[in-house]
């Protein structure tokens, strides 16, 4: 652990951190179900479509605690990807495109892909 910290500090101080930085991207969805049974096939399949692209759930079905504004539409889902390209490739993939109509039939949704802030890539000794 100390070695990794020293190496990360060295890269940061020497200006090499930007070369090691990765910029994640996030798929964010607001979903309001109109048919709870109809969304089940989508829910059962969606993870297998984004795992090959390095995606992982950060939030799945969270009920938002709205503090200001109009609030979210239904439940929230956030999937993190290693890059914007990975997120876009997943969204455009045949596997995901095949199940999107299931979500459309089961309710109302708004979806976004946004780029996050750069993160320092893990350093392995």
What residue ranges belong to the model's regions?
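Short S/T/G/P-rich N-terminal loop/turn motif that feeds into the first structured element of a domain
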Residues: 13-76, 81-89, 115-125
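Residue-level detector of intrinsically disordered, flexible termini
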Residues: 7, 16-20, 105
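Short arginine-rich
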Residues: 97-113
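A short, charged, amphipathic alpha-helix used as a generic interaction element across diverse proteins
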Residues: 91-94
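Bacterial N-terminal signal peptides that target proteins for export
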Residues: 1-9
